[in-house]
């Protein structure tokens, strides 16, 4: 397989530019020869008038990142969305007129009938190519386009506009003697024969993160087209801090079997998703994904892994200098963080290598432990709401759950303060604060609601007992 890549989703929670260099080292050591970088609002595009995230890297930091990738023989593949996933631009008043459906339309994708949208995309592409000289492959995105958004400017045939725009973007990049990659799903959903309308040499990347469509894959293999595949090595569940691992291993296993059947697939991307678009809550991708990236690399190199426990132990000894507790890691991460606590604490305290990832896993598991306790308290209070309101709960029960309210508040604040210095070694402070805010601000406000409900319940019980 020519290209073995990991996806770096920068629209979500990013590491510091300095720490990211060490991640490139590890990916190269694992056997990857490419990194697909999806920048969005973390790149300071001049073309978008400086409207970027406060934690965006500088162009100089990106140049350093690109140079480091080159030193490690890791091909940096820029990904610049050409159709949708554009809310990082279109959410701003300055660009509202470019929205599909007009100024009051969606901020998700732009209007393909407007020449301005093509010109803006080209200007942004030029900035990326200037910062990353020597780029050989460029990904133009083009996935998940909504063909049903009413737009007077577009008319009714959005698919035709879509294909024309994708073709123009591909031709623009090809004229610079670069290979062009795009996501395949719009063509998959509207007729794969339409790939023939694209310029020769454009490479579809077939992404399937749950069930694989084997009939479609067989047709793609028989078509003679060069294509890549894409698995999902990380995606979070209900905004947990740690991602579940086992479903991602199943996806990688399925793709491993496909690669054995169709060895002509010329590239693969292990995607690590932080969020759908930049207005959604953030999740963690790299560096948290390092176990699954190793699992993917082993699969791409040697085929489907048949003994996961053996692989986990070998990974642990090589990466951390100690064996991993497979059952604790894969049964408890995300789902039972309190049970995972002993495992990640031992890892943090005893790892002789890559203590950074051990600390990151520990810190995010601590977040999940806090959330687990809050969810337990809230679930009980929600189930008891009628009883609380009626004032029919005994005082000892109300006191117990009022103590839960206190702990939700005090333990959360103390826990966050305790782990923050450790996490700021790897993540920008504003990024960490945004992550914490999205998980706890609303919950602590809800906690005050339960304080009010339970205080009233205690007063009603006291009054009831007087009668």
Task: Give the location of each predicted region.
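Generic alpha-helical scaffold signal
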Residues: 14, 21, 56-59
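Substrate-binding groove of N-acetylhexosamine-processing glycoside hydrolases
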Residues: 1-4, 16-25, 64-67, 73, ...
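An acidic- and aromatic-residue-enriched active-site/binding cleft used to recognize and process polar
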Residues: 11, 40-42, 81-83, 143-145, ...
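Conserved, charge-rich beta-strand/loop surface module that forms ligand/interface-binding patches
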Residues: 1-13, 32
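Aromatic- and acidic-residue-enriched carbohydrate-binding clefts of CAZyme catalytic domains
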Residues: 2, 26-29, 34-75, 84-119, ...
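Generic enzyme active-site microenvironment
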Residues: 7, 79, 141
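Generic anion/oxyanion-binding catalytic loop in active/binding sites
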Residues: 9, 110, 331
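Short, flexible active-site loop motifs that bind/organize anionic cofactors or intermediates
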Residues: 10, 52, 242-245
């Amino acid at each position: 397989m020519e290209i073995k890549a990991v996806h770096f989703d920068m629209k979500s929670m990013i590491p510091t530019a300095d720490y990211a260099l060490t991640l490139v080292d590890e990916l190269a050591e694992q056997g990857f020869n490419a990194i697909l970088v999806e920048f969005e609002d973390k790149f300071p595009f001049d073309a978008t008038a400086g409207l970027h995230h406060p934690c965006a890297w500088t162009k100089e930091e990106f140049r350093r990142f690109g140079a480091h990738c080159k030193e490690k023989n890791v091909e940096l593949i820029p990904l610049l969305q050409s159709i949708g996933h554009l809310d990082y631009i279109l959410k701003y008043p300055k660009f509202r007129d470019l929205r599909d459906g007009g100024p009051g339309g969606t901020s998700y994708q732009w209007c393909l009938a407007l020449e301005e949208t093509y010109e803006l995309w080209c200007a942004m592409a030029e900035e990326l190519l200037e910062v990353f000289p020597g780029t050989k492959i460029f990904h133009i995105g083009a996935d998940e386009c909504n063909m049903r958004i009413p737009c007077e400017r577009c008319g009714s045939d959005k698919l035709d506009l879509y294909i024309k725009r994708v073709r123009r973007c591909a031709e623009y990049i090809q004229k610079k003697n670069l290979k062009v990659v795009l996501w395949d799903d719009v063509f998959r959903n509207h007729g794969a024969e339409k790939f023939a309308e694209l310029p020769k040499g454009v490479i579809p990347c077939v992404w399937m993160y749950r069930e694989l469509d084997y009939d479609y894959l067989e047709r793609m293999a028989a078509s003679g087209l060069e294509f890549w595949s894409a698995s999902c090595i990380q995606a979070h569940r209900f905004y947990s801090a740690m991602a579940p691992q086992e479903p991602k291993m199943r996806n990688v296993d399925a793709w491993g079997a496909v690669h054995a059947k169709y060895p002509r697939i010329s590239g693969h991307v292990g995607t690590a998703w932080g969020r759908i678009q930049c207005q959604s809550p953030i999740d963690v991708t790299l560096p948290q994904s390092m176990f699954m990236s190793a699992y993917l690399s082993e699969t791409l190199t040697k085929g489907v892994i048949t003994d996961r426990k053996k692989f986990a132990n070998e990974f642990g000894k090589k990466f951390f200098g100690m064996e991993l507790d497979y059952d604790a890691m894969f049964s408890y991460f995300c789902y039972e963080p309190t049970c995972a606590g002993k495992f990640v604490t031992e890892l943090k305290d005893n790892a002789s290598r890559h203590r950074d990832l051990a600390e990151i896993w520990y810190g995010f598991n601590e977040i999940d432990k806090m959330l687990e306790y809050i969810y337990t308290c809230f679930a009980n209070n929600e189930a008891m709401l009628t009883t609380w309101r009626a004032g029919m709960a005994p005082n000892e029960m109300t006191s117990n759950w009022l103590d839960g309210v206190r702990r939700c508040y005090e333990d959360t604040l103390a826990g966050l303060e305790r782990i923050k210095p450790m996490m700021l070694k790897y993540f920008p402070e504003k990024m960490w604060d945004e992550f914490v805010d999205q998980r706890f601000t609303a919950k602590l406000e809800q906690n005050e609601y339960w304080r009010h409900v339970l205080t009233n319940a205690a007063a009603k019980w006291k009054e009831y007992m007087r009668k």
